[in-house]
Curated annotation (Swiss-Prot):
HAMAP family: UPF0259
Record organism: Enterobacter sp. (strain 638)
InterPro entries: UPF0259 (IPR009627)
Protein name: UPF0259 membrane protein Ent638_2284
Keyword Zinc-finger on entry: no
Pfam families: UPF0259
Length: 247
């Protein structure tokens, strides 16, 4: 039986709609974790404010020039802020991916699952998911920085890796290699969904500053929750598609 993207989209939409409250709670919990961790590890407001102070920054052209003209103390503050944002984002994404994939797995097996149970059930795979998401994010970002297209291609061919790691309990690099082979042979079914996910994430980044009117922390939680829901839709699609391909 041939698999069509339309049938998988419809299946994904029905599943997401039926389990929307659980998805929303997982997305919200992970957004809160991301924001709280980011706030806990970030420099203080006074230190952040100091990044824009000093005559040494006047006349800087571009981000690279700006960083070069910073004092060592300012560079340390910027590095700490970047590390806090990256680390908290990776933790939140790993928990969200694990929770969503375990929820889909359990619901597909006929079990009733709450958001907390799904996240709790994902605990054993979270360390591997964290490393996997770190590696794939690094590769995709490097590809996008080069010419954009390599980054998009990497995002497509590595998209099955989290599903394989959770569903088949593969190792990190085995999941990445298997994902490349499977996604490449099913490019017409995978590429549109991943490209749509990337476009949705990009649009959210463009509108994210508007959420700051709700206060920075609340705005960050709202933006992260929406971002998590977008990722949840893609994960459900990839899980359902992977299940159909294996049949």
């Amino acid at each position: 039986m041939s698999i069509t993207a339309k049938s998988v989209y419809r299946d994904t939409g029905n599943f997401f709609r039926n389990q929307f409250i659980t998805f929303l709670l997982i997305a919200l919990l992970c957004a809160l974790i991301t924001v709280v961790l980011g706030h806990a590890f970030s420099p203080s407001d006074e230190q952040i404010a100091s990044l824009s102070q000093g005559d040494n920054l006047a006349g800087s052209v571009g981000l690279f020039d700006l960083v070069q003209n910073m004092t060592p103390e300012q560079q340390q503050i910027l590095l700490r802020a970047s590390a806090a944002s990256t680390f908290s984002g990776l933790i939140g994404n790993a928990i969200m991916a694990g929770g969503v994939l375990l929820m889909v797995q359990l619901v597909s097996a006929g079990q009733r699952v709450s958001a907390l149970r799904a996240i709790g059930a994902s605990a054993p795979v979270l360390p591997k998911l964290f490393i996997l998401i770190f590696l794939t994010t690094l590769l995709v970002q490097m590809g996008i920085m080069l010419v954009v297209v390599p980054g998009v291609l990497l995002a497509i061919i590595l998209s099955f890796a989290p599903v394989m790691l959770v569903q088949d309990k593969m190792g990190i690099f085995t999941a990445m290699r298997s994902s490349i082979k499977l996604a490449w042979s099913n490019m017409r079914l995978v590429a549109p969904a991943v490209i749509g996910w990337l476009l949705a994430k990009t649009l959210l980044l463009l509108f994210a500053p508007n959420f700051a009117v709700l206060t920075p922390n609340i705005g960050a939680v709202v933006a992260n929750t929406i971002s998590n829901l977008i990722s949840a839709v893609l994960l459900v699609y990839l899980f359902r598609l992977y299940t159909l391909i294996r049949q």
